[in-house]
Amino acid sequence: MDQHDDFDSVSWRQDPESDISRPTTSGTDADESLEYNRDTNGKRRMSSVHEDPPQAGPLADAVDLAGIGDGVLECRVDSPLKENDGTKDAYISYLVTTHTDFKSFQKPDFAVRRRFTDFYFLYKTLYREYPACAVPPLPEKHKMEYVTGDRFGPEFTSRRAWSLHRFLKRLTLHPVLRRAPLLAIFLESPDWNAHMRLHSTRTSTGNSDGSGTGIFDNFTDTFVNAFTKVHKPDRRFIEVKEKADKLDEDLNHVEKIVARVARRESDLEADYNDLATQFRKLVPLEPDVEVPLQIFAASVEETARGFKMLKDHTDQNYLGSLRDMEAYIVSVKALLKTREQKQLDFEALVDYRNKAVAERDSLAANPSSYYASNPLTSSPASFIRSKMEDMRGVDHEQSRRERVRKLELRIDELTREVESAKTTSEMFDEEVVREVADFERIKAVEFRDTLGALAEKHIDFFQGAINTWERFVAEMEGDLDNDPEMSEHGRGGGVAA
């Protein structure tokens, strides 16, 4: 991995004037000028047959890294609806609306209803079929809502709808995942349930045909690698990991503060509603000022409704976006861990080969060491092997030559495995670099959208409060002008004061 040591670090920020900062999704429709390349890790990248493929090395620019193309694919998730109400099979479905100019779709605008399990199936399948992608995660199950029976409540369903919307938007902004055939079927197919059953059957059949030891082998490799350090860490990914940890920590602090802000907005809503109730209790006691009291109480209630709208957006949308981004960062760090394991696999194979080469060279340079008749001058393994061969009547020289021959075959096999592992590791490195750039672009778009929406809600709230109280002042001044006695009393009171 020495050739990567001089690579520039991956930036976590993008030039705001570059194309990758645009919220418009990217991608191109499949035509004769484009071809898909699939690597050994199952990830597809688009490259033009008329141009050199984009590189992810030190000369790569932001567009190369992010894989930007043309095309529009915009999705929205909203309108939670309780299905099969009154039965034990009740569930919530969400309206998924899509606008696109992809030729692979039958219409440019269409809508379907999907439930959470449909989104979960989409996520799990993409996660399995695109291991080199940091597939955006789904929102958590929120098991407490299932225990308390509030999983059909408007707050829970609204919060989940926003999270599912962000999940789909991240997919549509990803240059590879937005072209996944399963995503197109999910967005458009009226027979989605039948497709899920068929896809699940094929997947289970494929797993049963495979080796039964594959899962155990993968687990063993992961377990062993967990206690192994990389010999030559790549500075690019060290910096990405450090910045991911720092961003995760900062978002956690912001999340706690925003949650406190949402609670205070909820308290203000309750206090303003209580204030309006108390003013209305004054009406029977002060019939002469009934109209001003009623108008004032109504204005206070209107302000309380504004606080509720602001609190709902802060709690259900913006706070959820912070938690969803934290989960997305976990996916990126998991991809970095997978990349590290591939490098560990490569380095372990190199170590095995070097040990085999050293043993072969030792046998060739010092044949007598193989016989090891003296336990004081030989290794325990050589001495025991020599004694066992003596007991069996084996020719030591012939055994040594056979051992050298087997080592030569083993070295040849390990050399091929090393080259294959090196190629896989380097290809995965390049994919991870692109994936980090994709994450950067998606993160920038999402932050801009969520902060912009939060700012608009605050503008609406304060503008509404200004309009409410300006209207109250105007009505009070109008009543004062229309009531000479009240006007005279007010002026007299002012002089007396």
UniProtKB/Swiss-Prot annotation:
Q: Where does the PX domain lie?
A: 72-194
The answer to whether UniProt assigns keyword Cytoplasm to this entry is: yes
What is the superkingdom listed in this entry's lineage? Eukaryota
What's the stated role of this polypeptide?
A: Sorting nexin, involved in the separation or division of vacuoles throughout the entire life cycle of the cells. Involved in retrieval of late-Golgi SNAREs from post-Golgi endosomes to the trans-Golgi network, for cytoplasm to vacuole transport (Cvt), and autophagy of large cargos including mitophagy, pexophagy and glycophagy.
Q: How does it sit in the membrane?
A: Peripheral membrane protein
Protein source organism = Aspergillus fumigatus (strain ATCC MYA-4609 / CBS 101355 / FGSC A1100 / Af293) (Neosartorya fumigata)
So where does a 1,2-diacyl-sn-glycero-3-phospho-(1D-myo-inositol-3-phosphate) get bound? R115, T117, K141, R160
Q: What is known of its domains?
A: The PX domain binds phosphatidylinositol 3-phosphate which is necessary for peripheral membrane localization to the perivacuolar punctate structures.
Q: Where in the cell is it found?
A: Cytoplasm, Cytosol; Preautophagosomal structure membrane; Endosome membrane
What's the protein name? Sorting nexin-4
Identify the Gene3D superfamilies for this entry. Arfaptin homology (AH) domain/BAR domain (1.20.1270.60), Phox-like domain (3.30.1520.10)
Gene from which this protein is expressed:
snx4
Q: Where is the composition biased (Basic and acidic residues)?
A: 35-53
Q: Name one GO cellular component term.
A: phagophore assembly site
Task: State a single Gene Ontology molecular function.
Answer: phosphatidylinositol binding
